[in-house]
Amino acid sequence: MKYKRMALAACALLLLLSATNLSAVLTDEHPRYHQHLERPAYTPCAEYDGETLCTHLPLVLIDTGGEAIPGVPIPDADSNIENDRFTTTADGSTLLRASVSVVDHAEGNNHPADAPTLQSVIDIRVRGNSSRYFDKHSYLIKTLTDDGAASRDVAMLGMDAFDEWALHGPYLDKTLIRNYMWYNLAGEIMDYAPNVRFCEVLLNGVYQGLYVMTETVSSGADARLKLTEPSKDTVQMSYALRLDRGSGNEVKNIETFSQYALRNLQDMDIVYPETKWLTPERAAWIAQDFSDFEKSLYSYDYDTEPYAWWEQADMSSFVDYFILNEFTCNYDAGWLSTYIYRDVRGKYKMCIWDFNSACDNYSHPVTEPQHFELQYNVWYYMLSKDEKFINAVIDRYRELRQGILSDEYLCAYMDDVTAWLGDAVERNFSVWGYTLEKDMLSPAWRNPHSHAAAVAQMKHFCIERGAWMDENIDILRQYSHESKNKKFNH
């Protein structure tokens, strides 16, 4: 109750403050494109007739020729759809050949009939784990050459050219902005976080609502993770891994030390390099290389030079990942949708993903803001035993609370993004408005019944969470105290 009163008082104070200059807080170390800061807000076209779609957001027009996009859950005889059975195309494929047109004018508004600024043949499917069960589908898009014979890198909505994209449709997140906001803030402080752009989507001419075009976690010669590309002469290579539910491509699935030694029930798969570079020998080398890191992390020498964990892992990356996911109580991190990568010439780093359920937006149970949790997850279990790591977390948290994680900055960011989206929010809920009456979170009192209430709820959570962490961040020291870790030390 104490922190709720503090949060309410802070919210009231923020309403009295003038708009925060967001750009003053943004860093030069990791320059980041924030769409809502760079693109003008909506002003009606002179010829706008009130019926034709006219928007300042990019338009993504997907044409499947009337064919259904595969990947939709199939209910069984008892109408149970959580059975890992999904639709395919008529020929049994998990991907559908289609086309995409993008209308994204640098100035002025966009309309479906405008000349496209980008066109491409694509393969498309419904994507997501729990999110694929939502009525509003998210999609995986692979861009192809005109004949469909090979992948094609395209600069989608101004992002680095690549051939794979996640088109995220906010559904459970009634603010519509969680992924956009937290990916961008992560990109300000970490070496890489997926770039994102709001857009509005039409599927076969039918309006689908507000979406977020998102970079998938991968690497190109000069894109995304920007890892050193594989050499033909050696099995040693840069790689990116995902801790989740595994891949449908068996050569990408690997078993590492934490799985067989710690009985970790999640699967690890290789998301980079792509299949054309990934021989069984290289997959085996990656599994062994990463297992060697995990073994060193779980050894008696985990915090002792020259074998200490930070000799192989970038401490600042692991610290920032911990703080962002703890601050937002994004507790899929560390066991689902968890990405870790290493350049063949460098150290392990973390990459954020999926804040759709962050800030107390899990279907159940309630995410109370008065606790820490990541210290129990696989790699952070050992990192949290190291005083250097815990001290770095505490110092970095206090630094970020003076800027990007301050109450003023976070609330102003939410307000500015929401204001910039403008009528696109109303258009989205003209299709998905029933979700505002639908109780998707449990217990029922957690469900906001308007977009404004959803944004206010996220503000309240961030302020309450920040107030609690400000007062209690030092309790993390208990996990690195000698009395708790005698058996792990020399």
Model-derived features: positions:
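Short glycine-rich loop/turn motifs
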Residues: S138, W335-S337
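Middle-to-C-terminal accessory/interaction subdomains
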Residues: A68-P70, F134, M268-G334, R342-H490
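Phosphate-handling architecture centered on phosphoinositide signaling
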Residues: K2-A313, T435, W445, A452-K484
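Conserved protein-kinase catalytic-loop segment immediately C-terminal to the catalytic Asp
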Residues: L202, S337-R342
